[in-house]
């Protein structure tokens, strides 16, 4: 059995063919000093061997190590039988499912959004609304990402205040950040 890499909603394994071409996926180092890796889709292979990846200005240079990946296509289950493990195991979202419990104002606000995607520090986008969940206290704040104050601190603006969240808190899992998208249709919780 080969090692599987999960990225987004896709699963990858190492592609031993070595044939890098447009549309291929690669695992690459994006932060040399910290040893941070990411998965990217190749949009162009330059004549000099550089790989241009989807996204603004992402280039894998000749001195950057990378591993060629291929996507594992799994047989889809019926839509009704599928359970999102992260959704199912989240105590807040389980509480939302149990309608006999009274919801806090923050939880009621969360129920207005039906799409929540966990994001990591390198995925944050300015002006996008995020739900910031503190693991220990269970508190949820909503705010717009304003950018990095410095390489290790992200700034979020709320109605009358701002939050400074360290990248270390995100990496350790002490704080989770979810991108929230308001559903235009009727909420699934109503």
Swiss-Prot record:
Taxonomic path: Viruses, Duplodnaviria, Heunggongvirae, Uroviricota, Caudoviricetes
Species: Bacillus phage SP01 (Bacteriophage SP01)
| Designated name of the protein | Putative gene 38 protein
